[in-house]
UniProtKB/Swiss-Prot annotation:
Protein family membership: Belongs to the glycosyl hydrolase 13 family.
Subcellular location: Secreted
Residue sites binding Ca(2+) 2 per the record: 190, 212, 214, 233, 235
Gene Ontology cellular component terms for the protein in this record: extracellular region
Reaction catalysed by this enzyme: Endohydrolysis of (1->4)-alpha-D-glucosidic linkages in polysaccharides containing three or more (1->4)-alpha-linked D-glucose units
SMART domains recorded: Aamy
Cofactor(s) recorded in Swiss-Prot or TrEMBL: Ca(2+); Na(+)
Protein name: Alpha-amylase
Length: 514
């Protein structure tokens, strides 16, 4: 239950704005609204059935308007239960007996290929998760000369040089030389966090020819190249060549349509720019790519876009935090500020908007969960507006399976009507009425490419109310209803194209043609 403020509400002020039309990642000429789904959550069961779940869900996903899915890391991690963010062998997609298992947490390579085939047959694209920052689960240790650094300032060395035993020897005995004969050794990395000889955990910076932190990364903690495990050295030419080769192989082997880049702020920016370009050139495909640069600062994200020559998109982290704040202030958030400091307001064509993900869900390291009551409002905000490429979280659709008392319930019944609104009605010019601390709204006039298209949306974090909004002259005389089912009244669009639309307390309503 949200706390509501007593307020005299006046909704007559009209704020009109024209936003940049965003070409969709599906095709450059497609008239269909693109919608991405992150098809996993952190606590996806370790039952080896996830690729089968994805295949079985392909028709449903297409029907509700999902045009692309982001799959979890598909390669062998340091154990069968690893989510893929502790990558051991990027060439083992659940095909070889390694780390005590053939399958990954999610299933086998052939099952994944079958799932992708089913998705493609229904015009749903597939984006692979790319974890390039580090490697984990080495087969043996190696002697390395290293120094300790200050975790709060990785440029500050806090010890003399000494020998450590680092887990940096990757031989891949189960795969051998299949697909690649490249073996990883200490000189392919520039740091680690464990000395096996002393059984101590530190951040170790390696010594040796050319060894230093990659400098073109986030400046947090002095230099944020190091994150975890054995940190890959993208100043090493053999590493650069091998990783480009793998990216091309990965895209072709799974017929991928794009990528999600993990931990981008910890990886040399110019390398990521060149890596994306190399894969695009080799495959001849657009390979839509979105980078996870976790920073609640649009300026930092804009800097990353600049450093990578705008050849990638980024997740709109500032918008996520605005939505989280709006959900947690008991009706006290000024809804006129939802777009303040966001990527979608600065670079709408490069913003992947989202409400929740596997890192922000309850119990995770970046936990910043949007409260359940607000999620339908948040999804309406990212799914029915013209700017940004919106993403739906698996955990919001199907619920999360962790042990926190705050686990996310399935919101499928709330989200699917909003997806239907996006798929069938959210087209044409947009008019914004973001002019009140509680109740904000927007309309879409519709266009000729989608029959009966056009909509009017209202959301409020506090008291309900109404707004008079312009729906377009072409919609004059039509009767519109609330597709969410939250209100039973209908609205007749006047001869001047205007209508009076209503919303309940702490709720969302999306009106479309009957």
């Amino acid at each position: 239950m949200i706390q509501k403020r007593k307020r005299t509400v006046s909704f007559r002020l009209v704020l009109m704005c024209t936003l940049l039309f965003v070409s969709l990642p599906i095709t450059k000429t497609s008239a269909v609204n693109g919608t991405l789904m992150q098809y996993f959550e952190w606590y996806t069961p370790n039952d080896g059935q996830h690729w089968k779940r994805l295949q079985n869900d392909a028709e449903h996903l297409s029907d509700i308007g999902i045009t692309a899915v982001w799959i979890p890391p598909a390669y062998k991690g340091l154990s069968q239960s690893d989510n893929g963010y502790g990558p051991y062998d990027l060439y083992d997609l659940g095909e070889f007996q390694q780390k005590g298992t053939v399958r990954t947490k999610y299933g086998t390579k052939s099952e994944l290929q079958d799932a992708i085939g089913s998705l493609h047959s229904r015009n749903v694209q597939v984006y692979g998760d790319v974890v390039l920052n580090h490697k984990a689960g080495a087969d043996a240790t190696e002697d390395v000369t290293a120094v300790e650094v200050n975790p709060a300032n990785r440029n500050q060395e806090t010890s003399e040089e000494y020998q450590i035993k680092a887990w940096t020897d990757f031989r891949f005995p189960g795969r051998g030389n299949t697909y690649s004969d490249f073996k990883w050794h200490w000189y392919h990395f520039d740091g680690a966090d464990w000395d096996e000889s002393r059984k101590i955990s530190r951040i170790f910076k390696f010594r040796g020819e050319g060894k230093a932190w990659d400098w073109e990364v986030s400046s947090e903690n002095g230099n944020y190249d190091y994150l975890m495990y054995a940190d890959v050295d993208y100043d090493h030419p053999d590493v650069v060549a091998e990783t480009k080769k793998w990216g091309i192989w990965y895209a072709n082997e799974l017929s991928l349509d794009g990528f999600r880049i993990d931990a981008a702020k910890h990886i040399k920016f110019s390398f990521l720019r060149d890596w994306v370009q190399a894969v695009r050139q080799a495959t001849g495909k657009e390979m839509f790519t979105v980078a996870e640069y976790w920073q609640n600062n649009a300026g930092k994200l804009e800097n990353y876009l600049n450093k990578t020559s705008f050849n990638q998109s980024v997740f709109d982290v500032p918008l996520h935090f605005n939505l989280q704040a709006a959900s947690s202030q008991g009706g006290g958030y000024d809804m006129r500020r939802l777009l303040d400091g966001t990527v979608v307001s600065r670079h709408p064509e490069k913003a992947v908007t989202f409400v929740e993900n596997h890192d922000t869900q309850p119990g995770q390291s970046l936990e910043s969960t949007v409260q359940t009551w607000f999620k339908p409002l948040a999804y309406a905000f990212i799914l029915t507006r013209e700017s940004g490429y919106p993403q739906v979280f698996y955990g919001d659709m199907y619920g999360t399976k962790g042990t926190s008392p705050k686990e996310i319930p399935s919101l499928k019944d709330n989200i699917e009507p909003i997806l239907k609104a996006r798929k069938e009605y959210a087209y044409g010019p947009q008019h914004d009425y973001i002019d009140h601390p509680d109740v904000i709204g927007w309309t879409r006039e519709g266009d000729s490419s989608a029959a009966k298209s056009g909509l009017a949306a209202l959301i409020t974090d506090g008291p309900g109310g109404s707004k008079r909004m312009y729906a377009g002259l072409k919609n004059a005389g039509e009767t519109w209803y609330d597709i969410t089912g939250n209100r039973s009244d209908t609205v007749k669009i006047g001869s001047d194209g205007w209508g009076e639309f209503h919303v309940n307390d702490g709720s969302v309503s999306i009106y479309v043609q009957k």
